[in-house]
Swiss-Prot record:
Region (Disordered): 1-27, 83-153, 213-260
The name this protein goes by in its record: Putative uncharacterized protein DDB_G0268234
Native source species: Dictyostelium discoideum (Social amoeba)
Ranges annotated as biased composition (Low complexity): 1-25, 86-151, 232-250
Superkingdom field: Eukaryota
């Protein structure tokens, strides 16, 4: 019994030594096993690493660590217009100040002749900050009366002022209008007949003029294409006829035809002779 106890005690010591060696190996490579063996990541002055069951809890071991983050915490700033769009005059600084000057909106230069459409929303401020110049053309008449006396909603005409705009040296045409005005105009037109609608010059300034010469050129091109197709068909037919004639004049095909004709003639002659001879 005593020998067995000695053997058991010696085996326990060996097991403890093996456990300590394993713990030391885990300490050396703790960056690989940090997620699985957190209890091994302890300072050396705490004693054993906790694997041998010395009564040190996991919470007590981890409480010895003092993690200090080097990152500065994020500041909770309310998303206001001033914070999202600071003025260009404010210099960028690292101070955590949320007060800034109000945002400055770049306003295009728009002629006063369309102030009814813009409701004085735009003004001529900040003219030096943009390269947009506008000039209005002759506005469309604001009244339209049909032959039967029906008045069409004029709100469409008041907003259809064609604006010639020059942006960076390139000239373009803008036609601002309200979709509600267009709907009202179409509703007013629903009671008109076809002739009255065709006689209304409402959308004439918007549509580009038709170039009749371009239409004629297009028709001529189509005619030329059709003529080319007809000529190609005729050429193909002529080529086929030439090929057939060449077959007749070809000596090899001529011999074949002669042999076949000779065979048929001789066969017919023999048949006639046999019938006449009673065979």
């Amino acid at each position: 019994m005593n020998e067995n106890n000695k053997n058991n005690s010696s085996e326990d010591l060996n097991n403890n030594n093996n456990n300590n060696n394993n713990n030391n190996n885990i300490k050396k490579t703790h960056h690989r096993y940090s997620a699985k063996y957190k209890h091994s990541l302890v300072p050396s002055n705490v004693g054993n690493s906790g694997l041998s069951g010395n009564g040190v809890s996991q919470k007590e071991l981890m409480s010895t660590f003092k993690y200090k983050s080097t990152r500065t915490p994020r500041l909770k700033i309310e998303p206001t217009i001033d914070n999202l769009f600071p003025s260009q005059s404010t210099s960028k600084s690292k101070s955590n100040t949320t007060n800034s000057s109000p945002i400055t909106i770049m306003k295009p230069k728009v002629s006063k002749s369309i102030s009814n459409y813009s409701n004085n929303k735009y003004n001529n401020n900040n003219n030096n900050n943009n390269n947009v110049s506008t000039s209005t053309s002759t506005p469309i008449p604001t009244t339209a009366t049909t032959t039967n006396g029906n008045n069409i909603d004029s709100s469409l005409f008041t907003s259809l002022n064609s604006i010639q705009t020059t942006i960076n040296g390139k000239q373009s045409t803008m036609i601002p209008f309200s979709p509600y005005s267009l709907i009202n105009c179409l509703n007013s037109m629903s009671s008109l007949d076809e002739n009255e609608i065709n006689n209304l010059p409402i959308f004439a300034p918007i549509l580009p003029p038709i170039n009749q010469q371009s239409v004629n050129d297009l028709n001529n091109n189509n005619k030329n294409d059709n003529n080319k197709n007809d000529n190609n068909k005729n050429n193909n037919n002529n080529n086929n006829n030439d090929n057939n004639n060449n077959d007749d004049n070809n000596p090899t095909t001529k011999k074949k035809k002669v042999k076949s004709q000779y065979y048929m003639e001789s066969l017919a002659e023999r048949l006639s002779n046999s019938n006449s001879n009673g065979e």
